Amino acid sequence: MSNYIVTFKDGVSKDEIQKFKDEVTSEGGEIGHTYDGLISGFSAKIQPQTLQAFQQQASISDSVIETIEPDSTVTIQ
């Protein structure tokens, strides 16, 4: 299981985002932080099969998912 940040397009409801969070946890993943400020989304440990389903969803032109990116440490130097 790897850590990812899933972000959603503007206007996506909290209920819609919750459905994706529920899918993560029902498949054995863990939700980390929820983002509901400048971006809407969440960080999570996501099972490979769930990640694949999210990536397929994100590839559809009218998908509510904006991005799925590996969660990593960012530094400024």
How does the language model describe each region?
Residues 1-4:
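Short structural boundary motif marking the start of a folded domain
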Residues 7-15, 46:
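Short, surface-exposed ligand-recognition loops at beta-strand->loop->(often short) alpha-helix junctions
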Residues 9, 26-30:
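Intrinsically disordered, low-complexity segments enriched in small/polar residues
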Residues 32-77:
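Autoinhibitory propeptides
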Residues 17-27, 53-62:
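Short amphipathic alpha-helices in soluble, non-transmembrane regions
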